[in-house]
């Protein structure tokens, strides 16, 4: 399991999501969390991600184009929460969202 860690700000979280997606390890093999990391787990590789505005902008554009503005609003609100697992929640929501497209929030 690879755990991607980042600062608890929007650009860092979006960059972390970009790196996890780009790693091609698969959703079962990655987890994302904000720092500071509490208890380290055995058999996990921890990878700190520095914020990158271009990567964050790429994720933002993809969300708005492929899923929609309402999805972007939910991602933003989740990123602003104080939960350490917010990046992981957003990552898994986006996996679902990119699969279903603009119909993700319908029903």
Regions picked out by a protein language model, each given a short descriptive name:
Residues 1-54:
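N-terminal ordered "arm"
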Residues 41-107:
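Charged, alpha-helical interface segments at or near domain boundaries
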């Amino acid at each position: 399991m690879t755990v991607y860690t980042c600062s608890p700000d929007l650009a860092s979280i979006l960059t972390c999501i970009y790196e996890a997606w780009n790693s091609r390890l698969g959703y079962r093999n990655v987890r994302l969390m904000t720092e500071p990391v509490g208890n380290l787990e055995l058999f996990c590789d921890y990878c700190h991600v520095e914020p990158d505005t271009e990567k964050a902008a790429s994720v933002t554009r993809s969300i708005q184009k492929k899923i929609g503005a309402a999805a972007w609003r939910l991602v933003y609100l989740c990123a602003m929460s104080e939960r350490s697992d917010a990046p992981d929640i957003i990552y898994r929501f986006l996996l679902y969202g990119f699969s279903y497209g603009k119909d993700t929030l319908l029903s």
